Amino acid sequence: MLQPKKTKFRKAFKGRIHGLAKGGTDLNFGSYGLKALEPERVTARQIEAARRAITRHIRRQGRLWIRVFPDVPVSKKPAEVRQGKGKGSIEYWAARVKPGRILFELDGVPGPLAAEAFSRAAMKLPIKTKVVARLGDTSHLAGE
């Protein structure tokens, strides 16, 4: 699973996710992409589950890019532990995703296959998403 090798600080504030994504909103690598429509923290496990769903569906053809990285440590106290005594230990890593952010990109696969792969990946994610394509390409809409 994805996680940073080294961080400046061990633990992070919870924070809030405001506004729209400033960067990472356009397709840079592939012909098709999966774009986030809601703000949410996406965990490393969810990213990995979505990646597996895509790669299993496209069956080793084409190329996949993961455009988000889980760089935020999420801490949690154990069950039935009294409050106080410091912040809990790190439970998992997450990526803060804003609306408009491209999560995954695909290239070298037909449009309907990419759309189906992304719809399977979207089921593994806690946010609403949509499939986007390069300007003028509507072949991913053929299956609808």
From Swiss-Prot:
Statement: the UniProt record of this protein carries the keyword Cell inner membrane: no
InterPro entries: Ribosomal_uL16, Ribosomal_uL16_bact-type, Ribosomal_uL16_CS, Ribosomal_uL16_dom, Ribosomal_uL16_sf
Molecular functions per Gene Ontology: rRNA binding; structural constituent of ribosome; tRNA binding
Pfam family, one: Ribosomal_L16
Matches recorded under SUPFAM superfamilies: Ribosomal protein L16p/L10e (SSF54686)
Any one GO CC term of the record: cytosolic large ribosomal subunit
Annotated family: Belongs to the universal ribosomal protein uL16 family.
Assembly behavior: Part of the 50S ribosomal subunit.
Protein name: Large ribosomal subunit protein uL16
Taxonomic source organism: Novosphingobium aromaticivorans (strain ATCC 700278 / DSM 12444 / CCUG 56034 / CIP 105152 / NBRC 16084 / F199)
